[in-house]
Amino acid sequence: GYDNVDIAYAKEKNVVVENTPGQNSNAVAELVFGLLVYAVRNFYNGKSGTELLGKKLGILAYGNVGRNVARIAKGFGMEVYAYDAFCPKDVIESTGVHAVDNQDALFEQCDIVSLHIPATPETRQSINYALVGKMKKNGILINTARKEVINEPELIKLMAERTDLKFVTDIKPDADAEFAAFEGRYFSTPKKMGAQTAEANTNAGIAAAKQINAFFADGCTKFRVN
């Protein structure tokens, strides 16, 4: 993403900022399932786990990553649901995915919810006690989006009350030590890992080079974010 770029200042100085959407989407989607299999098999602690076949997976935000998650989920035989405030329901359903009316419905209906929303003023800390609390028994929350979308104190409170819930992420929370107390129900990679594959890095580098060349060749700003 471009969360670390001061978009407003760049615009003020007439600096063009672009991103390379979709270049790491498969890498992130594959990691979602790496985390998910780890969680449903009880973090390989020797105890019997569960299977993904027939489980309901909810995807919050149906962009490049969300669509790849849906593609992989179908291979596991999962029922896939999605909600995206900016993607029409008929577009979602045209890909063989059930579209729901709102994020509350997504959390209520699904066994597992995978987050793919950006960190915006509207989404920051929106994944909170009330929302996650709607999940079914033995629900699993996966975050490969941004840590800012999680209301950490409220999720900690909920996990303390509901010992059936699991939370896995590739973004180390600020309250990692507190989450770690939920042994067997929480896992975080040491650093952001979703896009860290050789293929994703190559794809992003090539895409960036092409965009820079296009900008200087004919002023193309197709992927401008400011």
Regions found by a protein language model. Give the residues of each.
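Structural detector of well-ordered beta-strand residues that form the stable sheet scaffold
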Residues: V16-E18, Y81, I140-I142, K166-V168, ...
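Short, acidic/turn-prone active-site loops that include or flank metal/cofactor-
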Residues: G1-D3, G22-S25, F86, L106, ...
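Rossmann-like adenosine-cofactor binding region
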Residues: C87-A181
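NAD(P)-dependent dehydrogenase/reductase Rossmann-like domain
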Residues: A175-R185, M193-N226
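Glycine-rich NAD(P)-binding loop of Rossmann-like domains
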Residues: A39-G75
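Oxidoreductase and adenylate-handling cofactor-binding alpha/beta cores
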Residues: A29-N45, K74-M78, I206-C220
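Phosphate/diphosphate ligand-binding glycine-rich loop within oxidoreductases
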Residues: G1-T50, A175
